[in-house]
Structure formats: structure tokens, C-alpha cells
UniProtKB/Swiss-Prot annotation:
This is Probable 3-ketoacyl-CoA synthase 20. Gene3D superfamilies: 3.40.47.10. Belongs to the thiolase-like superfamily. Chalcone/stilbene synthases family. Contributes to fatty acids elongation. Plays a role in controlling leaf anatomy and plant architecture. It comes from Oryza sativa subsp. japonica (Rice). It is an enzyme of class 2 (transferase).
Amino acid sequence: MDRELVRTVKLATKNHAGVLFRRAVRHLPHIVAVTALVAAAPRLSTLLAAAAAGGSTMRWARALWSDLAGELGPSAPALAVACWAAALAAYTYAASRPRPVYLIDLAGYKAPREHEASRAKTIAHFGRCGRFSGESMAFQKRMLERSGLGEATHFPTSLISLPVDMCLRTAREESHAVIFGVVDEVLRKSGVAAADVGVLIFNSSLLSPTPSFTSLIVNRYGMRPGVVSHNLSGMGCSAGIIAIDLAKRLLQVHENTYALVVSTENITLNAYMGNNRPMLVTNTLFRVGGAAILLSNRAADRRGRAKYQLIHTVRTHRGAHDQSFGCVTQEEDDAGEVGVSLSKELMVVAGEALKTNITTLGPLVLPISEQLRFLATVVLKRVFRADVKAYLPDFKLALDHFCIHAGGRGVLDELEKSLKLSPWDMEPSRMTLYRFGNTSSSSLWYELAYCEAKGRIKRGDRVWQIAFGSGFKCNSAVWRALRTVDAAGLDAGDNPWMKEVDMLPVDVPKVAPIDETSYQIPN
């Protein structure tokens, strides 16, 4: 039995044991209550007689105790202690249960029309920058034709004006527009005052100024001095789920409060203006975007107000492997130009991270039949050296909607095949890539908003969000819809898709040639 099998079996066993333990403990109060009823049943006549005679609850209890003491004799005190211990255990369990975390509402940023850039406009502006060689321009054009992006993704003004203005001032302007736009919207939609927010988490991987963006939000919205704030940077496109997981953990500690999570990425300072091919890919994929998510642990919010309940978060970090650690890096080229380099091993690394992540997630959500099939193929392959393909569980048996990080067409194609998903399952991710491009950690929320705008979300549905990011990380979140989201009740101010949702989906060819004559830069 090789080490890979041992590791897989150990992990699966640990996950199953954890699930079984949680299920047993979850029903502990019911077990204690039923046990007490069974024990009291033979003395029901005593209780009824005491009740008929009138008197307080304590009198009934004394009557029951006298009856028991007469039967048990010297062992009665021990039984009393055992009963009190059971009651204390039940209370302790109830007090220590994880607090449910609810998603009240979300907002996705949609830049004004003047920020829209067709693919022809994008190539034209790249050409006028004067920094790219002819070979680099041809490469970016080929990548853009195969990227899956549409004709109305958004760039910051700094990159579609001439000359290009990449500086800290314009980077702040871009981030401020996104942050204030989504925070204003989510607070308006939810009706929650900024002063009521107890936890604030912000993530932006490539821009982390001083004061931090969390301080900017606290200052702008006049949040209370006791707000618990965290500013995450350098964590890549999977940072949105990391922020949700962190918020979940903080909401276990801070009672009866709201958590505001803001996810975005800055494009201005991270466009690459050199000629190193691995660093040019990001120019063709990343676009302006951001999202704000309002969470709550208030029990009152579950009834009619919250949209979803967070069921699971699973985080996988493969940074211990050099290949995984180095496949997405921010660096300088030989000319001193800064950019993000994507290695050729990215797809392999992402596949390994996904496999590790779903090995942990599977026992939490999949039916036992699927888990046994998966384990059986591992044993056949590793122990008996049988020539069988590794069995990938059918997650559609447990999950209804899939929001996969819109990192690029290649990533989506690979996951569609690996997870055996249908075009309908992939539609939210593909349309997000087409309409908004790769918006980094916020892409998952555009995808969920797409599902809502299409009227897909029904009460009880489960949504799986899957994110990949540098490091290398693969993170998952599973949500359960607490109510049906009525698409007819949404307007353009509630959802970034509403103005065009009826025109989607569209067919996106694998190669869509760019007609450079369709756009001319004004003189």
C-alpha cells in the first residue's frame, strides 16, 4: 500500500469520523430528552396525581423523587447526580454549538459605460501604449480571441486613456469607486446601518496601501470604534472564500452582529507593460470588479430576511510544494516592469489542489454511495494496480448550483470535464467571464448574482462556490438557500445582471477573431 493511498484513506477516515461524531452530538439533546421521558413514564401516575392535587412544579418533582427513592433506595442519590450531569452536558452542548451564519444580501460592482472596452478597443489601446513589441501584441491578440471574454468588460480609466496613467493616485481612484459602490449598495439593500456592523473584512491581493482599505471603509461610513477589522492581501483569487471563512470564525465569537466582507482587485497598478510572455496573459483576462457580502449570526435574521445559510467552508493550501508555490507570482522582468507571471504548470497544480479539496468536502456533502465508489477505485488502483480510472464523485447528487471562479476559459473547460458538469451548470461561470472578465476573488459573487437574476435559486437549493488562487490554494464554500429568490422583484440597482439577463446566455466560440478595424482611437 503506497503513501498516496494511505494518505487518502486516512483523510477519508478522519472526515467520516468527524461527520459521524457531529451527527451523534447534534442529536444529544434529543437523546437526553427521550431518555428522561422513558425514565419518567412508569411514574406518570404519580405525576398526574400530583398535578390533580394542584401545587407547584417543585411539588410534582418532589413527588416523583419520593417515588423513585422508594424504589431505588441507596442508589437514588447517584441517579440524581447522573441526571443532573446529563442535563448539564445537554446545556453545555447547546451553548457550544456553532452559531449559524447567514448571508443577508450581496452587491456586485458594475462600472459606468465609459469604462466598457471591446476587445478591439483593448488591442488598440495596448498598441498605442508604445511598450509592447509586435510579437507581444500578436500574442495578446491570440490570447484575447481565445479567452472567452466579451465586448463590454470594464477597464479603469487609467488604462483606457492616453497616455496610460498607472500611479498610486489612479489606483486609489479605481479601488474607491468599486469599494464605495458595493458597500453603499449592500447597506441600502439590507437596510443595515454601518454602525451595526461588528466585523469588517477586506481582501485585495495586489494593492495594500496605508492606511488600509478597512480603515478607509471605517472612516467613510463612521463605523463604531469596536469594529473587528482585517485587511487581507497577497492571497490571490481565492481570497474571497478565505474572507468568508474568517468571517464565519469571528461570528462564532462575536454575538448578535453583522459581518461585512468586501472582495476586489486593483487593475491599475497591476497591468503589465513589458514583453515577458508568461506575464502578458493577465492583461487579457483581468478586469475591474468587486463585491460586498453582508453576513449575520442573528437568529432573528433567519426568518424571512436572510437569503442563504453557510453550511461548509473547506480551505486547501498546497504551498508546501514548490511547484504549487511558484506557479503564480508577482515579479519584475529583466526591464524592471512588474507583473504577475503564470507558469505552464498552472492547470496541473490547480487539478491537484481541487482533488485535495474535494477529498475533504466530499464526506460533508456526498451520499455514502458516492463516497464508497470513490474509495473502491482508489483501492483497486493503488493496491491491486488495476487499470481503472480514478472515480470522481457526482457532486450534482448533493449540490444544485456551481459557481466556479471565472479565471479563464481553460480553467472552466477543465473543471466542466473533471466534475462532469453540464453546460447549464457552467453557464453562470462562463457568462461571468464573458460579461465581466476575470474579476479575481469577486467573480464567485457575480456568478451567484447571475443565478438569482435567472430565477434559479429555490428554497433548499445548495450552492457550491469553488475558488483557486496563488499559493497555491483551492477553497470551497457551500450555501443553502433559505428562501426562493424572486428574480421578478429585482431591478438594475439590486443586481448587476438585470439590464441584460434576458439576452444571456450567448454562445461563445472557442476562437472569436478580433476585427481591429471596428475601433479607431480618436486623435
